[in-house]
Amino acid sequence: MTTPKHPNAVSLVSAIGIDPGPTTGICLMEFINGGAYPIPEHNITLIQASSGTALRVLEAYLAHFYGDERITGRVAGVEAFVTGQSAGTRGKNADLTRQYVMKFTELLELFGYYPKVRKAADVKPWATDKRLLRAGIPKQPDSMRHSLDAARHCLYAAVKDAHQKDPLA
């Protein structure tokens, strides 16, 4: 992470979480570097949309903040697509999800983020509802489950990769 050019400038960390699929969840969070929880609500955005729309929304967000010198750290967590024996891991939707994991990862890298692709099984046990709530992310209805899964990846990346404070610490 770099230091802002102005000595009194606020240093921000931008974290993004993505749960790719036919319905994609995105979570955008900005942290005052090393700041405390809960994060003010205006610094947390949860989005759920079709994968193509979500890709365009993310690109617009990244372009808007590209070059913002206050953002000294950019991390992202993208949920990996794990192939298994269930019906959801084969067929057209599975192929699209695999493609979108790569498309989102490439887009994030293009805008200076350091995305890590992780399995849900590695993130979910740590990113509990209690931890999300303490971080300022309220419980979501089932219809928003993809954005909530994205929030898990976002918070995990912020704490594990950008060394932000654990909300439960």
Question: Where are the predicted features?
Answer:
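Phosphate- and other anionic-substrate recognition elements at nucleic-acid/protein interfaces
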Residues: 2-169
